[in-house]
């Protein structure tokens, strides 16, 4: 919980920092708190849809909890954003995850 507390403290002064929000969501996943991680990822992607890495992690979280249809949509949105940003590796990872769920 120490890392979570540190990240929360940093977010108090930098509430719009996408990196900190993403890092906090990952810490919640490590602690087994998928619900809190999901809220953070969803908020982050609403406010900063270009933060490409969060799509993959949110998609994997959704897969883990059995929300496959939403995971597919998240991967699709992430692939669009990755293409816009020219992030081919991120695009490929999300495409692979999407294909695994689709077929």
Q: Predicted regions span which residues?
A:
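TPR/TPR-like (Sel1-like) alpha-helical repeat modules
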Residues: 68-87, 99
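Structural marker of alpha-solenoid helical repeat scaffolds
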Residues: 13, 47, 64, 81-85
């Amino acid at each position: 919980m120490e890392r979570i507390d540190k990240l929360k403290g940093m977010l108090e002064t930098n509430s719009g920092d996408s990196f900190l929000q993403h890092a906090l969501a990952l810490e919640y996943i490590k602690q087994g708190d998928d619900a809190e991680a999901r809220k953070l990822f969803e908020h982050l992607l609403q406010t900063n849809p270009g933060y490409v890495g969060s799509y993959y992690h949110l998609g994997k979280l959704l897969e883990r909890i059995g929300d496959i249809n939403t995971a597919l949509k998240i991967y699709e949105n992430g692939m669009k954003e990755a293409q816009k940003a020219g992030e081919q590796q991120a695009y490929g990872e999300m495409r692979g995850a999407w294909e695994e769920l689709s077929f």
